[in-house]
Amino acid sequence: MESYNAVTWLLDRNVEEGRGGKLAYTDTVSELTYRDLQKQSCRAANMLRRLGVRREERVAMIMLDTVDFPIVFLGAIRAGIVPVPLNTLLTTDQYAYVLADCRARVLFVSELLFPAVKDIVGRMPDLDCVVVSGKNAYGHKLLSEELARESDSFATIATHADEPAFWLYSSGSTGMPKGVRHLHSNLAATADTYAKQVLGIREDDVCLSAAKLFFAYGLGNALTFPMSVGATTILNSERPTPALMFALMNKYDPTIFYGVPTLFVAMLNDESLKHERGGKRLRVCTSAGEALPESVGLAWKARFGVDILDGVGTTELLHIFLSNAPGDIKYGTAGRPVPGYQVRLINENGGEVADGEVGEMLVHAPSAGEGYWNQRSKSRSTFEGYWTRTGDKYVRDADGRYTFCGRSDDMFKVSGIWVSPFEVESALITHPAVLEAAVVPEADPEGLLKPKAFVVLRPETKREGLDEALKDYVKQKIGVWKYPRWIEVVESLPKTATGKIQRFKLREGAHH
C-alpha cells in the first residue's frame, strides 16, 4: 500500500513549491508563514511523541481560532495521531461525555475555555495530561513552553489514505454529539471538488471564515481550502459579530468571506453599520449551516455587489456537496451537486422521486467519513456503503436544482401535503415587521397538525393587527394551507452553537 499523510500534501508541499515565506495565518496577534507552520507542526508532533501518545490514539482540542489550532491539528496528523477538535461552546457535562467517548490521551485547551473543563479533567480515565494554549497553565502544561522544548524536524509518519486522520463530533441538534471518523484522503477530496471547482480558490486569495475551525464547514474554509493552494487565512478567536466582521474586512481586505445565514442577516440589518462596504477585494461569499433565504441573498448582492454562494454540507461528508456556483445562482435553492458528488432523492420505500416531489437526500461522496465511533447501528443507517444518508428532505426542480425542505424530522403534513418549516419561515422573514422566524407543527383542537410560527419582530414594530396581517401575507406568498394558524412573538429563538434553529425545543414547548 502506498503511504499518504494529509500534512505532506496540505503543508509540506507549499514549502517545497516555494511558498515557505508566504503568510499562512494571522490571528490578529501572531503570524505564521508556511515554513513557520511546518516547523511548529513538527515540534507539536515531537511533543505528542514525548507525551507518550501513539499512532491512531486521540488527542482532544477545545481551542479558539488562533494560530495554535493549525499547529496542534497538523502536528497530530503528521505523527499519525488523531486530533479531535471540539465545539468551544459545549457544557461541562457534554465535554465529559465526549472526552470519555473518544478516550483522549491529551487535551489541548485554550486558557479562556479551561474553566469549562477544570472540574472534570482529573476524572477522565484515559486523559494523561492537559496542555493549555495561552499564558496561564492553571497548574498544567503550557503549549508555548512544550513546543519550545522540541526539535523543529520530524519524520512524518507514513500513514495511508484510508487511515483515520481526525474526528469531528456532529453538532447534535438532536441528542448527544456523535464522533465522525474522517480519513487522510477526505481533506484533499473537499479541496479538489468544492474549493477548486466551485470557489475557484487561488494562491492570492485571503480567506475569512465566520464559522470556527472545529466545525466541518470552518475547517474546510480556513484550513483545507487555503492550504490546498498556499493562500492566506485570517483567524478570529472571538464571537463573529457584525461589527467585528466588518472591522476584520476593513483591516485585512479578504477576497473570500465564508458566513452563515444568521450572520449575513445581522450584518445587513445593523443600523450602526449601514456605511460598511465589506472591503475592496471581496470576490465571493459562501453560506452554509442552514438554507439562505432568497431575500437575504438579493439584499447582500444589492449592497455589496458580491454573490453569496449558498450550499449544503454535513459533518459526515466534511464539506459542501450541493451548491450554487458563480454565474449559476438561484437564490432560495441549494443549487446543484458539486462536481465529484452524486445525489439522489428517495421516498419512504427507497424509490426515486420525480422532479417536484419531496424526497430524502442520499449522497455519494469522496469525502464521506468511515462511520461514527462506537455507534454501530447509527453508522449502518447513515453510511450505507456507496450512499450516505443525510436525513434531510429536498425537492429537485426541472433544471436540476435542489431546494431544502427541512430535516426529515422537522417536516410535517397538513391536509395530507408536506409542509416545509423553512418555506414558511422564508416567507415570514420577507415581511418588513419580522426579523427571524421558526415554524413547528402544533395540533389543533381536532388533533390535526397545523403550522405554528414563533417570530422575533424588528424594533418599533406595532403589534396591533399583526397576526392577521402575517397570516394573510404568507397565504399570498406560498399558499393557503401553509399559513401559520398561530403566531407567538418571542424575544429570541433557541439555536445551536452553529446558529441553527433548534426547532425540536420549540416543538416540545408547542405540544401543550
Report each predicted region and the residues it spans.
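Conserved AMP-binding/adenylation subdomain of ANL enzymes
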Residues: A188-V206, A216-I256, D270
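AMP-binding/adenylate-forming catalytic core of the ANL superfamily
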Residues: L90, L107-V109, F257, A365, ...
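Conserved AMP-binding A3 loop
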Residues: T33-D36, I157-A158, A165-A189, G335
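Conserved pre-ATP/AMP-binding loop-to-beta segment of ANL
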Residues: G21, R149-Y169, M176, G200-V206
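Conserved AMP-binding/adenylate-forming core of the ANL superfamily
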Residues: G21-T66, P70-L74, T91-A96, S144-E145
